[in-house]
Amino acid sequence: MRRRIRTAYGSALALTLALGAAACGGGPVSTAGGGDGKELAGQTLTVAGVWSGAEQKNFQKVLDAFTEKTGAKTRFVSTGDNVSTVVGSKIEGGNAPDVVMVPQVGVLQQFAQRKWLQPLSEKTRQAVDADYAPVWKSYGSVDGTLYGLYFKAAHKSTVWYSPEAFEQAGVRPPATYAEMLTAGRTVSDSGLPAFAVAGEDGWTLTDWFENVYLSQAGPQKYDQLAQHRIKWTDPSVVEALRTLGALFSDKKLLAGGQKGALATDFPGSVEKVFGPEPEAGMVYEGDFVAGMAKDEFGKKIGEEAKFFPFPPVGKGAAPVVSGGDAAVVLKDGKNQKAAMAFLEFLATPEAAAVWAAEGGFLSPNKALDLGAYSDATLRSTAKSLIDAGDTVRFDMSDQAPAAFGGTKGAGEWKLLQDFLRDPSDPARTAAALEAAAAKAYQTANQG
């Protein structure tokens, strides 16, 4: 997200600002149940999230649809990447938002452990049971209680490429990880570096690792590592780092080499492939690449910007890594009724369809008609996410305590940047990751 899904585009451009939405007239009956559709009139719902730029603009349309439906005014506050710190300071200052769009499972769990959250309503729970794969309920729950509704998801197992670059090199979308590296070297030989890697943003490197690890080590090991039930010094981690290091150490594969990758942020990596002066043929990241290629560089998705699924590594299965933003209700918010009604609204395909029509969005809600998405590529990625069901695995770094998996210049982000700079010793990197993880989990458990 975040960060990331997601959140990724928004986190890369995050600005701290607060926008107000003007109240609209009463509309149909509120999703809160009963009444004349105006029972929330006079209330102002404050929603905090990481989004800015195009993502914030599109989410505002969802807020406006809620206003039209219920009469409640809305106000969005952008937190930037440090959601936990910003929300904590607002709670301490007596100015807590009513709803927070949380981009990390670890942060949601942290909020619940601190007793900041309200359990979701029965109506929302019923919608989740009916219309979401069980994995999404699991990621939104703490100790069996549902606190988070996943409204926006990301398919983070997509590799985006320039069809022109592939045509020039005479290569096709690869079916395996080894084929992807071979195709990349062929693209490089044709005159254009293979991959634009956004090494300046450490979260993109965690996504690279997670796809390799899920495919190579398998979902059981992935779950164990995500929960720190095995150590980062496990041989499976070292092997995944070795696999990733083969890419990071190959100057034919990285636009600008390791130094260039470390100086490239996420928006810059997309620009290197789809901008006016291409510097690479491929960029790995989630489906949200499409929104940026379209909005920022005017590319026709499916024609001038295409993707292939992140290919399987060795004998493993193709990975499906996801991320997402979960809506939670804060106990200290001043408008509990409006907050609960808003989450009931977000649980409907009606709410998801508002953003789906704008692009840069996927919903884990199975009840959303795929025809709501604005183009065939989005429909394809959305179907892949839904069809994966419980084989989807949530972004591992987002499940970790923020000190390890979600802090710029620290923990996993920094250590994988160090590994990109020098990938010669995977075992040493694994040991450093374990030391940082052990410290972060110990602190989180004490808290």
Each model region followed by its residue ranges:
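Short, low-complexity disordered leader/linker segments with a strong preference
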Residues: M1-T46, E68, A438-G447
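Extracytoplasmic/periplasmic substrate-recognition and gating elements
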Residues: D64, D295-F361
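Extracytoplasmic/periplasmic solute-binding protein
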Residues: Y147-F151, L181-E239
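Hinge/lid segment of periplasmic solute-binding proteins
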Residues: V105-S157, L181, K306
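Extracytoplasmic ligand-binding clamshell segments of periplasmic binding protein
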Residues: P219-E296
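C-terminal capping/gating helix-and-loop segments adjacent to ligand/active sites or protein-protein/ligand interfaces
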Residues: F361-L362, A367, A382-A438
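Extracytoplasmic "Venus flytrap"/periplasmic binding protein-like
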Residues: A65-Y132, E167-A175, K272-F274, G281-M282, ...
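Short, solvent-exposed loop/beta-turn-alpha elements that line the ligand-binding surface or hinge
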Residues: E39, S121-Y132, G199, Q216-A240, ...
